[in-house]
Amino acid sequence: MELLNGTGLWPMAIFTVIFILLVDLMHRHQRWTSRYPPGPVPWPVLGNLLQVDPSNMPYSMYKLQHRYGDVFSLQMGWKPMVIVNRLKAVQEVLVTHGEDTADRPPVPIFKCLGVKPRSQGVVFASYGPEWREQRRFSVSTLRTFGMGKKSLEEWVTKEAGHLCDAFTAQNGRSINPKAMLNKALCNVIASLIFARRFEYEDPYLIRMLTLVEESLIEVSGFIPEVLNTFPALLRIPGLADKVFQGQKTFMAFLDNLLAENRTTWDPAQPPRNLTDAFLAEVEKAKGNPESSFNDENLRMVVVDLFTAGMVTTATTLTWALLLMILYPDVQRRVQQEIDEVIGQVRCPEMTDQAHMPYTNAVIHEVQRFGDIAPLNLPRITSCDIEVQDFVIPKGTTLIINLSSVLKDETVWEKPLRFHPEHFLDAQGNFVKHEAFMPFSAGRRACLGEPLARMELFLFFTCLLQHFSFSVPAGQPRPSTLGNFAISVAPLPYQLCAAVREQGH
């Protein structure tokens, strides 16, 4: 009765507070060692959750790095986290300790999206037999269907032609190029996965791109961070369905595409696309409970290819066109090199790249300056490791700050400016820096890097071969600030695409 009247609540409240504080102290035991990386003092229970800005994590990391050094720690709720900055420390983690830092930490929100131990795809999969099996399959199959070969190059070149037609149809009007670039890159991925192409005005394609964008927004930001930090909240009935509605709709959309592909798949015929090849492996794996080839994992592999393979390259090209309208002298110099090496009639080819050092330097500088993936996907240590004289215990989440490498003032002459000469020597030859790692490094480096490099060169040169891009008359100069949502995209901007006349 005293408890109900409130007189007995104080002892219970005091006990609860003491219990929570003891649990909190237990989760901070790493900080009790003298060689643990320094960092801001965490709040009880919340840790440093309120001391970082999820909407602009790169800037939060920048400020903390300048205060605590190249290797510093955070406590997100009760999850210990170490942020690794600058080239030397990043190389230690990704290369020297590559085997010990290749695993991914658990992501509780993914369980709500149907991710299971044997259906994690490739990008977010735990480091182990299933990941090796799927990465080996993905690399092998992408090569089978043309990655690094003339066949895929011809497909990309053909799609670049369709993209040029779409720009021409605008008749020099002021447009935001983002949608058209997304459609072009989506078609390249769709060709690999489904062996099909969508017209740019196809409602099906427009719907798919809308769902991709919505799903990426849903899994980034403050709410997902809170749910991953305190996964018990995911048990609230209906919460996950409401928070991740767009993600689940996107999954259902892909399920329909995969079902359509399955109805026309003939196991007796050579695979037409990646989906056919995966379905063939599913058939082989029947009765093997250890295999990662199953229908659920097919969906996750496709999600990986669309998000990692399409969005990143389209975003980089969006940065490229923005920088061309902001730096017209650079644009004209690229066009001059295109005219000298390729001309204005023949389609660009990958063999041209070796003879176009300035264009190659500009593409690399776009990737460096755009810095679209500033924070590498999280990893977790599988044993104690030593980095820069600090000891990082087993089970610590690692965040690799690639932005600190791409914009390191000790490496780059003008780290915060767009400066293609970063990749040219005194004689004008192309030079690649070891600090250039937009695709990460080590065992979990981007498996689609060869495809992305091909797409960037062919789309970029084809566009500048046919058009001159400029800021629309009467409009202010666009900003080079980015919008962070897993990747960093330019703020919305407008441009005009004027068809180049022969000989100009």
Curated annotation (Swiss-Prot):
It is a peripheral membrane protein. It is found in: Endoplasmic reticulum membrane; Microsome membrane. Keywords: Endoplasmic reticulum, Glycoprotein, Heme, Iron, Membrane, Metal-binding, Microsome, Monooxygenase, Oxidoreductase. It catalyses: an organic molecule + reduced [NADPH--hemoprotein reductase] + O2 = an alcohol + oxidized [NADPH--hemoprotein reductase] + H2O + H(+). CDD domains: CYP2D. It comes from Rattus norvegicus (Rat). It is an enzyme of class 1 (oxidoreductase). This is Cytochrome P450 2D10. Induction: P450 can be induced to high levels in liver and other tissues by various foreign compounds, including drugs, pesticides, and carcinogens. One of its GO terms (cellular component) is endoplasmic reticulum membrane. Cytochromes P450 are a group of heme-thiolate monooxygenases. In liver microsomes, this enzyme is involved in an NADPH-dependent electron transport pathway. It oxidizes a variety of structurally unrelated compounds, including steroids, fatty acids, and xenobiotics.
